Amino acid sequence: RSVIMQVLGTYHHNFVTHLLEAELQRQVYALAEAGQSITAAVLNQCKGNILSAFWGDTVEIDDGARMTWMRQPHYYMGLYPYTYSVGLVASTAMANLVRDQGPPAVKRWLQVLKAGGTLRPLELLQTAGIDLSTPQPIHDAVAYVGRLIDELEQSFAG
């Protein structure tokens, strides 16, 4: 149970938290490019709208939640939270390939590691057999999370 909970926490943090942060950044950049002033009130409103759209009526978004942008150092350094989600999707896809194909997938992954930064990221992952230009790897990662949840529920049931 402990391992499953840890893995689920990792997926939640990287799939939910970081993607919501990336959406805030996308919106803030759009506002800045449109010449709008970016104030704390604007950031609170953006964050609140993003959280409300994501959670719908299942979670009450209070003032504290609207201000969570203030505690994220990512916003002040390099602005890259989406890479956490992408990395987790890619690593889940690679783990699935290794599980399903064994040594041939391992050999392709070693080729990726040897290639390093000689190819663009999408091309590099395609070398391993991972196509992030489609939504399939995301669907597969979400399915994996679903299987983990099922396994966790079973562990509590019996």
Task: For each feature predicted by the language model, list its residue ranges.
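C-terminal, non-catalytic "cap/extension" segments appended to globular domains
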Residues: 22, 28-158
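Acidic/histidine-rich catalytic neighborhood
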Residues: 1-32
